[in-house]
Amino acid sequence: MTIDLSKRSYQKELLDRDDIPFGDIRRNMFELDVINTWLGGHAISISGLRRLLSGRKDVRICEIGCGGGDNLRALVRWCHKKHIRIHVTGIDHNVHCIEVAKERWKDGEAQWIHSDYRHVTFGREKPDIIFSSLFCHHFTDEELVFQLRWMEANAGAGWFINDLHRHYLAYQSIRWLTKWFSGSYLVKNDAPLSVLRGFTRGEWQELLRLAGIDGSRIQWKWAFRWLISKSFLVE
């Protein structure tokens, strides 16, 4: 089978449908947490957070597309080890994901918002840091330009994005890993497709240019991830 990696795929993932039974979504979220733990996805988000902290010991952080809250949990536990006080907000348009996040949260106070992130306003209580993880590849380029501008306008200290590098080795590796080790039909279908919906460095550079954003940093991270970040503080 020939795979075209020259441009992003816009084929919809199963998880983007509205008729998926929630038990299947729950299984999908559990496996994604395992994948992020073992393949370094959470470590990349921690790296993004560390860059933007700039020595502060009290931080407000918001994740858009938070799912079941696994990424926020990883960041909170890291902050606790570093004696950093962290206030978290998770936003997701899927009410079932918000319910799971609330159910599984054991790490102190958190605010969970069931909404499309585009409809959320913070007023004077802006989060210091806004981030997303494996969220951007669900959107078109036009939608991502809006998303970048939204993050730029609503974060107080900066923002970061953790998402997939579209690469042949990444595609084949996740296809075989999920074929043999996943029990979720959603993960088996969506994980390889997610890579095809991922990005190259040049595409991120163009998206940032279209959004009118200067001073951001694009870093390649193992395993086949991009960490895009912008600090509003002088470095």
What are these regions (language model features)?
Residues 139-151:
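A short, conserved alpha-helix within the catalytic core of class I
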Residues 62, 68-71, 75-119:
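Class I SAM-dependent methyltransferase SAM/SAH-binding core
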Residues 1-30:
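N-terminal, positively charged/glycine-rich alpha-helical extensions of SAM-dependent methyltransferases
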Residues 164-211, 217:
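C-terminal alpha-helical "lid/dimerization" subdomain adjacent to the S-adenosyl-L-methionine
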Residues 131:
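A conserved beta-strand element that flanks and buttresses the S-adenosyl-L-methionine
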Residues 156-164:
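Conserved beta-strand signature within the Rossmann-like core of class I S-adenosyl-L-methionine
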Residues 215-224:
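Conserved S-adenosyl-L-methionine
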Residues 22-48, 52:
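Class I SAM-dependent methyltransferase Rossmann-like catalytic core
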